[in-house]
Amino acid sequence: MECTNNPQPRTPWNKGKFVGQKAPFKPKEVWAIRARLQMENRGRELALFDLGIDSKLRACDLVKLRVRDVCHGDRVASRGSVLQQKTQRPVKFEISPGTREAVEAWVRKAGLRSDDYLFPSRVRRSPHLGTRQYARILEGWVSLVGLDPAGYGTHSMRRTKASLIYRRTENLRAVQLLLGHAKLESTVRYLGIEVDDALELAEQTDV
């Protein structure tokens, strides 16, 4: 009997599910974490935190950034671009002056070259920081400023600036492009917009 061994197409793990519902950071929480990292001279983590907030990249893309993805020569560019692992679509991101300063300081301190991973792993078996390592580092940041780690995750980093941009502009298309989503509905679900708006209406209604 002939046996075929054609693998079935994989269904995305998050198909039909609400993902990314870990809370985004509030501006005051971003400032608090940044201040603590600066005070404690944790240059690697400061660069990782600031770039994570600015880039809005998924954890799997953030940890695989190479120096050349954000640097032109010995200077960090004002914009970066990366091919997303999940969608194989390119996405561009801005790099704010404060983040450029933090990343430049980290690159100099670590002696990184253009082809090096921006955040090398301290574990020998991996050339770059892993997503689990990143999640543990983030948990430390959350605890550092007295927040509950259960309420935050790597998607909190990705959602923070995207949520602020939407709240200030209500421009969903812009946020979709910044997050690299193929469909606008994905952005709506990711930000939890319909749920948040419904709750706000409910809170404003007395009976």
Model segments located where?
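Conserved catalytic core of the tyrosine transesterase superfamily
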Residues: 1-207
